[in-house]
Amino acid sequence: MATTSDDLRARRKAAAENCERWLSHPRVPVQDRLRQLTEVACEDSADVYGNDGDVAALEQEVADLLGKPAAVFMPTGIMAQQSVLRVYADRAGTDRVAVHGLSHLLVHELNALEEVHRLRIERMTSEPRQPRPDELAAIPGKLAAVTVELPLRDGGFVLPTWDELVVFAESCRERGVPLHLDGARLWESTPYLGHSLAEIAALASTVYVSFYKVLGGLSGAALAGPEDVIAEVRRWQRRLGGNLYTLFPYAVSAREGLRTVLPLMGDLYQRAVELSMALQSEGFRVFPEPPHTNSFRVYAPQAADTIETAAVQRMETTREAICGRWQPADVPGWSWIELVVAPHTLDWQVDEVAKAFGELLRH
């Protein structure tokens, strides 16, 4: 028997298909997306198993942006990070890696580090904040690598301050253990940290970046670091089935995101701060306050089913999609969503967004 939540999901899906305006990421028909890729493709020849074409050009662009000697394009970030951590473990002769308890590696990857690579996870903390040097120091013995996710998505998109990140990186160097940055949203982190991509990446041995989130690529990721490490990562990419015959559509879309969306990071961050203030004036709460990136959590003083019903009804009547599905918060009677400020968000006025959200509480 269908539940109220099931009915709301079905209604939301149907309403979304009829929407004509989106606050974050619009729905683009497949045919239109393919035409867009045709218009922006720069290379005449496709890559073959990652060699030449847009893939090779993208790898060089990423290496240059991050100030690293080499980079490799991969179909997924999961594969990229598993591969580099496996390389570090094999080199160090230990299977222990230090990870945040809320990191993507542990929350969303079905224990792949343990199940596939037999790595042992040492949790520095599971608090919704970045790990501290003393928490790393509390883990005894030899470590293969330390990972930091910038920002920590499941902690609320939280970042360290620049000084905190520098001190943490120094603690890794003093211990003689490689620091790996999970930079799935690193592009979005530069305004808050106040430093360039290369300056941030210089604090770590290797860095992973994603192309399909704010940059709007089809899919895919890149890993940047020393040439010898990247060469070994390429071998693991092959072993894990990620060295596809050609990946040029993904690389074309990634390069277009670097050209057109990356320059907007400052504007997106500023709009996130403005929206967080406006939403609070409508009775919502936000975390972190102010936001650290273009993404943050919005909390509503209503039960999830109540405000979700209002959100779906608004989608049905206005054909506007302003938020994702509301989820129950830890506090009874409250609910929350993630709000991502994307390029299309800049087409909305701040007071227009605040009014739209306010309607959900006054429904």
Give the role of each language-model region.
Residues 2, 283-363:
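Conserved C-terminal alpha-helix-loop-beta "cap" of PLP-dependent enzymes
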